[in-house]
Each structure stands twice: as structure tokens, then as C-alpha cells.
């Protein structure tokens, strides 16, 4: 009998989770444009100890999830979708290990899948059970806050990333730039709309590829990786000046001025074999400490 009750309880919880996942509550930035990547955040206060906790994200683009500042996303370009598509896709994260018994901060870094306007940016459900067996559930609504992130698409189909904007504080429990945040806008949904679940497919790092050699011509450096791959380059910089602009292929990076910093794409990939890096009049070739190629492939987690 006890085993039967456990099975029934698990089935009910699964059904509840499925119902939660398809109960879409779309939100967006109040001023949607075609190129901006958006930071979303909210906080939830618990008065009980959490036993299990999940976050289901549906989006028409890509979304990286952070819980109490820690990265809960497992893969690159998540949730998985076909390139240049904007239909809703969803994925569910078990965030139990990140949960706290007092305040849980949920933060999402959203990007459109390609430069275009779509008012349905994010739908999120945070749900689970407490140690006493009771359940909780929260959905995305106008209480969520948002602001433009440090990155956006550029006119070359890549990204422009402003390293001067702090990439860590926005997902922390306490933030000091609250004046830059605004309330989200609730968006309507289409009747009988169900997102495609892509939990079984993911973009993952296949390998880290060193360059074979490089050529320097004045302050322009070309790195040759030998065989080509799909992914991006990760560039480590040292001694770059604040506001210095560096062009890494089609990506533009604006330096923070910190002693060491890294520049790499966030929500795009590119074919890489030879990579040319140059910069503005502040840039010097010796600002580059290391260049690595990151190869991205699609895996089926059920195989």
C-alpha cells in the first residue's frame, strides 16, 4: 500500500509539473527591439524548507538561467531550437541544489534567436514541494524586473558586448543599479499554444581547439586553427584600456579595463578556421594573452 501511495504521489506530481509547463505566462521588456539581449530577474521568499524545486522556461529565443547567482543552465544556446526559428520552445531545470530556505533569486539572460521583434520573450514557472509535503508555484508576471544586458546583436550578424557593464551583479541577491531596471510587460498568448519541449536535444561543447599558428601585420593578428569548426573563439586579454574596442571576427568587444578579461560570443556561433583580430587606436597585439576555439555540436541526451 505504501509503495502504491508513493507511485500515485509521483504520478500526481508529474502531472502537476506537466500542467505547469504548458501554463504559459509571457512577459517581455516594455520596449522590445530586434537586437537587444535582456536581463530578467525576480525574488521569491520561502518560509519553509524546500524539498524539490524546478524551473520551466519557455521562450521564443534563448535563455540562460541563474539561481542565487549560480548558473543552472547546462548547455550553450539553450533551449535547443532550429537556427533562425522563433516558435516557443521549453526546457525544465531541477534547481533543488541551488535553492535556499529564505529568498530565491531567479535571473534569466534572454536573447532573441536572431535579430527580429517578438513580444513573447519569456514564460517561466517556478514550482516544487516543501519538506512538509505542501507545494508551491509561481509564474512570470509584471512583478518581474528587466533591463538591457551588456550584449546585443550587431549588423554583421554577430554580437557587440560591452565589458564595462558588470556581468555578475545583475543576477545577485542584492543589486546596486535598481534605477536601471523596470517592470516587465505582460504579453497575450495564443489559444491552445504549446511549446516544443527540447530537453532531449542540446548544444554542447565538443572540444577546445588550440590555434596552429598566427600571423601579425602591424596590430592585426590572424589565427589559423587548421581544420574548421562551428562554434566561437574565446579570447583572453590583459592590460586592455577601459573602452578599448576589439574586433574578433565579426564580434565587437568593448573592454572593461580590468587587468584580465575574456571576450567570447554568448548566443551566436560562427564557422571558424582563420580568425582575424584587430582594434581601435588603443589596441595593441600584446593585449591578447590567449585565443581558444570552442567547437559546438548538437547531442541527443536520449542516445
Residue ranges and their predicted role:
Residues 1-21:
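Bacterial Sec-dependent N-terminal signal peptides
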Residues 20-303:
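Extracellular/oxidizing-compartment recognition motifs
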